[in-house]
Amino acid sequence: MPDELRAEKSFPSKPYDSLKNKSEFDRVYRKGFKKHNPFFSLFVLDLSKEPPKEKEGFKDPLSCRLKDRNTLCLLGLSVSKKVGNAVKRNLIKRRLRSLVTRHAALCQGFALVFVPRSDCYHLDFWALEKHFLEMLTSIKDYMNKALKDLKKGMTHTHAKQ
């Protein structure tokens, strides 16, 4: 088939991959930084600082998955039935995926887990984006401060090693 007749991809590849199983979610919950507001909780794990743990023939799924592909971040969505019916839950998930796609450069190298609360449905997209950006930038600032403190030998911050 000639190249002129071949259809181009209509959608670019998404800049994120999803967290796949309970152990990946649990790792982000345990080792990640968390931030809460009235609308959702955000758990962030910096994968560039995580040393890959390799056993016999076993690759660490979180840190190796970013290197294997051209994905920028890993995304997990945990939307409870308490948030609303399926239509409301799916709307929230679509909005959160869209936020990560729009701000892929900010999310680069992170594993993110969103846990929306029931009030999240009542936010419009722009208010949700504002809260997301505030939380993500404050977490990144806190992580940078904690990393500097760890390098100095100070452990008064709640930095995780």
Swiss-Prot record:
> Which residue ranges run through the membrane?
none
Pfam families per UniProt: Ribonuclease_P
GO terms under biological process: tRNA 5'-leader removal
Q: Name the EC number(s).
A: 3.1.26.5
The family database entries (InterPro entries) matched by this protein are listed as: Ribosomal_Su5_D2-typ_SF, Ribsml_uS5_D2-typ_fold_subgr, RNase_P, RNase_P_CS
Q: Name one GO molecular function term.
A: tRNA binding
Gene Ontology cellular component annotations, sorted alphabetically: ribonuclease P complex
What keywords are assigned to this protein? Answer: Endonuclease, Hydrolase, Nuclease, RNA-binding, tRNA processing
What biological function has been recorded for the protein in this entry? RNaseP catalyzes the removal of the 5'-leader sequence from pre-tRNA to produce the mature 5'-terminus. It can also cleave other RNA substrates such as 4.5S RNA. The protein component plays an auxiliary but essential role in vivo by binding to the 5'-leader sequence and broadening the substrate specificity of the ribozyme.
Q: How does it assemble?
A: Consists of a catalytic RNA component (M1 or rnpB) and a protein subunit.
Please give the name of this protein: Ribonuclease P protein component
Give the species.
Helicobacter pylori (strain J99 / ATCC 700824) (Campylobacter pylori J99)
